[in-house]
């Protein structure tokens, strides 16, 4: 662990912002002196949060960027409303309000994993003048399974936890997330289960899932509008991703005008953790590249 990692803790970076009368968001902030802001958006698995997804990435990115790692609505220490529009719209608009509340103007880069990748794309589509470059890891809503069965193994296990929220079902879900099974420790399982099994978290997760079949569900089908993205987009996929399999990248790669794709072998759905050093270099180089 580096000196920087030791200095940046959950407590030292933890902040709250009241972005609407009935919505308070929790986020982690680091690299405050840097000019360029990057927003990190976590995935949607049970017990997920910005810290659980990005704790080790935050110090590295904070060396170059002003980092805002946001607990999306319904997750972490953020409020957990159960009445909201399609979830990507819900999260993207909440992020816009957070940036306004914090006085962060101009464009921000967005780095999103899974559900967070979908929210990042929705933000870029709905607020194009506020979005810089996008780094998307196995993004939800953008991937279309051309060959893999649907629902995928990961989505099936996510639903199983929703119906029967036990520690055993959570462990089964988490093990699908990664290629390297050593990453799924008892400590991680216990931590995620404690966060996921509260009544508020379970209700929020149910509302999030329901929003993908509500009247405005088509707003979650991001691949339909992918051609509208004018930002540079880096798609990152794990070859062994069992949540949003690799073949799901092909439609996005074809439709997004300025997209590029990087595939990690020996990697599941959590590229930012399984390929930590390579991921950080790849994302940083992409975001700092001076090309248009």
From Swiss-Prot:
Quote the Pfam families the UniProt record gives.
Abhydrolase_1 (PF00561)
Which GO molecular function annotation, any one, does this entry have?
4,5-9,10-diseco-3-hydroxy-5,9,17-trioxoandrosta-1(10),2-diene-4-oate hydrolase activity
Q: In which pathway does it act?
A: Lipid metabolism; steroid biosynthesis
Query: Where is substrate annotated to bind?
Result: 44-45, 53, 113, 192, 270
For this chain's UniProt record, which GO biological process terms are given?
lipid catabolic process; steroid biosynthetic process
Q: Which GO terms describe its cellular component?
A: membrane
Enzyme Commission (EC) number: 3.7.1.17
Describe the task this protein carries out: Catalyzes the hydrolysis of a carbon-carbon bond in 4,5: 9,10-diseco-3-hydroxy-5,9,17-trioxoandrosta-1(10),2-diene-4-oate (4,9-DSHA) to yield 9,17-dioxo-1,2,3,4,10,19-hexanorandrostan-5-oate (DOHNAA) and 2-hydroxy-hexa-2,4-dienoate (HHD). Also involved in biphenyl and polychlorinated biphenyls (PCBs) degradation.
Q: Which PANTHER family would you find in this protein's record?
A: HYDROLASE, PUTATIVE (AFU_ORTHOLOGUE AFUA_2G14860)-RELATED (PTHR43798:SF33), MONOACYLGLYCEROL LIPASE (PTHR43798)
Give the family per the record.
Answer: Belongs to the AB hydrolase superfamily. HsaD family.
The protein here is known as 4,5:9,10-diseco-3-hydroxy-5,9,17-trioxoandrosta-1(10),2-diene-4-oate hydrolase
Native organism: Rhodococcus jostii (strain RHA1)
Source species taxonomy? Bacteria, Bacillati, Actinomycetota, Actinomycetes, Mycobacteriales
